[in-house]
Curated annotation (Swiss-Prot):
GO terms for cellular component: cytosol. Coiled coil: none annotated. Catalyzes the phosphorylation of hydroxymethylpyrimidine phosphate (HMP-P) to HMP-PP, and of HMP to HMP-P. 4-amino-5-hydroxymethyl-2-methylpyrimidine binds at residue 44. Keywords: ATP-binding, Kinase, Nucleotide-binding, Thiamine biosynthesis, Transferase. Its EC number is 2.7.1.49, 2.7.4.7. The keyword Lipid biosynthesis does not apply. This is Hydroxymethylpyrimidine/phosphomethylpyrimidine kinase. It is an enzyme of class 2 (transferase). Belongs to the ThiD family. Pfam families: Phos_pyr_kin. The keyword Transferase applies.
Length: 263
């Protein structure tokens, strides 16, 4: 039996809510075999992050070489790459891969805190964005990349067009950090058509890892053979269901219910 394979290149979340833990659960839900290259190890739980340790770039390269030499993926996604050196390794490794590449540009948190330095932002912009089949920035990341404030639908459309001019084939701006009518609404632009990806807005504080999950679900659906817009639309519906069944665990922001049919 041929089983699709998807690769995640991201950080490890000791609390199990985001990063590769969320990605691998998402792949498994979609019946896709998940492989990974860990870029950093975080000490975190539902209350927050207390420590981040980067994996040496050579260590990231070794993981990628091991996976790609034996378990070639049908799609991949990237998450937290942390620094410019790791980003350069990742960009150089995935550039020759002619598969869907879902780039989650983890630069700014959902609260607006910048997570990487200017050198890393420059490498991300210049070397990773042009490799993206789909780029999935949140509202704050989109504002940073587009160099503009985003307040309404016209701003979303303009920002998506500016960002796509930086190289990605398609841009999906996530609306989870937005307010009012645009809360939870995602905006798609692929150079030819715009689409609003809108589902039921789920009122829950337990949203940890939702951005990781969306990008991973797009990659999983692409690995299964869906056309890329259809993969994004299916991923949006999956995230909505996982949010509806999010887990109220720990003392803070719990994770999504990735295996919601089971628990």
């Amino acid at each position: 039996m041929a089983v699709p394979i998807a690769l995640t290149i991201a950080g490890s979340d000791s609390g199990g809510g985001a990063g590769i833990q969320a990605d691998l659960r998402t792949f498994a839900f979609h019946q896709v075999h998940g492989t990974c290259a860990i870029t950093c190890v975080t000490a975190q739980n539902t209350l927050g992050v207390t420590r981040v340790d980067a994996i040496a770039p050579a260590g990231v390269a070794a993981q990628l070489d091991a996976v790609l030499s034996d378990l070639p993926p049908q799609a991949l996604k990237t998450g937290m790459l942390l620094n410019a050196e790791i980003m350069e390794v990742v960009a150089g490794t995935i550039a020759p891969l002619f598969i869907p590449r879902i780039i989650d540009p983890v630069m700014v948190s959902r609260t607006g805190a910048v997570l990487i330095d200017q050198a890393a932002i420059a490498v991300l912009r210049d070397h990773l964005l042009p490799l993206a089949t789909v780029l999935t920035p949140n509202r704050y990341e989109a504002q940073l990349l587009a160099g503009m404030d985003i307040q309404d639908a016209a701003d979303l459309d303009r920002a998506a067009r500016i960002i796509r001019d930086l190289g990605p084939q398609a841009v999906l701006i996530k609306g989870g950090a937005a307010t009012g009518d645009w809360h939870g609404v995602d905006w798609w632009w692929d150079g030819q058509q715009s689409h609003i990806l809108k589902t039921e807005a789920i009122a829950t504080p337990h949203t940890h890892g939702s951005g990781c999950t969306l990008a991973a679900a797009i990659a999983a659906n692409a690995a299964l053979g869906l056309e890329i817009l259809a993969a994004a639309q299916a991923a949006k519906h999956y995230v909505t269901k996982a949010l509806r069944h999010s887990l109220a665990i720990g003392q803070g922001q719990g994770p999504l219910g990735h295996f919601y049919p089971l628990f």
